[in-house]
Curated annotation (Swiss-Prot):
InterPro entries: Herpes_US2_varicellovirus (IPR003485). Belongs to the herpesviridae US2 family. The gene is MDV091. This is Protein US2 homolog. It comes from Gallid herpesvirus 2 (strain Chicken/Md5/ATCC VR-987). It comes from the Viruses.
């Protein structure tokens, strides 16, 4: 039945820009974001498919409760950084290189890229159930979805003060924002809530319109059986799916909050 909903799960700086690469944001931000994502998928409409950048493997432990074919990865090839240092909380980065911490081969189902994975879900290969596609990561995985997939999308983001290091990316002005609101994060302890409030972070929820001129999707070969028993190439040379798990978990999404978010971006900083 295809994809019924697309949700972009990412981070934003005070200028409403996504980090260019996973490593351009601190690990604590990714850990918190992924945890909140897993809280939000309960009872969503459709079967949840959460695709993430492979270099977020170190922070993706909560996702392992999902069946293997419901948590694919994309091995992104992000551009080199510019050497520009960020500011504030957004500019705080880890000392290690995040991209080295990727899923080992066979640990997760792999998609060639987000667009070919989306086309696979829209095809007959995906079966009769509707899918809710969640895309988690920086601009190196989210940008192609925002610019190429011809559907409205939800944006579930955590906005932090300061600016990203490297080459941050802003959502183009020609992608219309239809709604801006907030959502309420979940916390394990009162101390976690207090720390979040003290950090001046904001949980942003947006409805984004379809891109006005979506790029033509790349041609992909039809699904074919691989030489390895139990494995199917579903959307390209790197897309592998093994025997289906026996169970899946339900999904839920509840958007909360009605206040509009005001941009903090300084003039000329885009």
């Amino acid at each position: 039945m295809g994809v019924s909903m697309i949700t972009i799960v990412t981070l934003l700086d005070e200028c409403d820009r996504l980090p260019g690469r996973s490593r351009d944001a601190a690990s604590t931000l990714w850990i918190f974001l992924i945890k909140q994502c897993m809280e939000q998928i309960q009872d969503d409409v459709g079967v949840p498919i959460i695709v993430r950048a492979a270099d977020l493997f170190r922070f993706a432990k909560p996702m392992l409760i999902l069946p293997r074919q419901h948590r694919p990865i994309v091995r992104t090839k992000p551009p080199d950084g510019t050497g520009v240092r960020g500011t504030g909380l957004a500019g705080t980065r880890d000392s290690f290189i995040v991209r080295l911490f990727e899923d080992v081969a066979g640990c997760s189902t792999e998609w060639q890229d987000v667009l070919s994975g989306y086309l696979m879900l829209e095809s007959e290969v995906s079966g009769n159930a509707p899918h809710s596609l969640w895309i988690v990561g920086a601009a190196d995985i989210c940008r192609i979805a925002l610019e190429c997939i011809p559907l409205p999308k939800r944006l579930l983001a955590i906005k932090v003060s300061g600016t990203w290091s490297g080459m941050p990316w802003a959502i183009p002005d020609n992608i219309q924002t239809l709604l801006t609101s907030t959502w309420e994060p979940k916390f394990d302890t009162p101390e976690d809530r207090a720390h979040f409030c003290d950090s001046d972070m904001v949980c942003v929820y947006k409805i984004l319109g379809s891109p006005p001129n979506p790029l033509k999707p790349p041609e992909i070969e039809p699904p074919q059986m691989s030489s390895t028993p139990g494995r199917l190439f579903c959307c390209g040379k790197c897309c592998k799916k093994e025997d289906r798990d026996a169970i899946a978990i339900p999904v839920r999404y509840t958007a909360t909050g009605k206040s509009r978010i005001q941009k903090k971006c300084r003039a000329g900083s885009h």
